[in-house]
Amino acid sequence: PEMRRACAVEAARLRRLMAESDDAPGPLVHELHACADVAERRGVAVDIETVGALPAVPADVRRVISDTAIAILTTAVSQVRVTLTALPEGIAVSLVADSPAPPPRLAAALGIVLEHDRDCRNLWVEARWTR
């Protein structure tokens, strides 16, 4: 299982790298959809929603946020909900999943703050970026 998870993480990162070079409106949403594909291929239901007009997010910040999402998407059992919310000062990306894994660790860098919580079954993680 651990080897499969590691392969899924790298497959999601490759998909994200390919999505980074696409000229798409809303590159973060586009990259998260590419990362979600790996979970969907395992039968995990992934729902990605946006709230508000998302600001431009630098590539290095998008990479950290999508790495956080990949960590959750590759360990989810059956469902993940991703919500991207535009904030006056940046963006918040919230993920809720039935993942048994511990929350991903993130070094405080690039103005990103990571919060998490867990109930019996679900893991909630929010990455908040401030410009």
Indicate where each model-derived feature is located:
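Conserved ATP-binding N-box helix of the HATPase_c
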Residues: 56-81
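DHp/HisKA dimerization-phosphotransfer hairpin of two-component histidine kinases
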Residues: 1-47
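Acidic ATP/Mg2+-coordinating residue in the GHKL
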Residues: 97-98
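Short active-site-adjacent structural elements
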Residues: 90-92, 103
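Conserved catalytic submotifs in the C-terminal HATPase_c
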Residues: 49-55
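ATP phosphate-binding glycine-rich loop and adjacent ATP-lid/helix-beta elements
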Residues: 101-130
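Short beta-strand/loop element within the Bergerat-fold HATPase_c
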Residues: 81-90
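Short, non-transmembrane amphipathic alpha-helical segments
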Residues: 35-38, 65-69, 73, 103-113
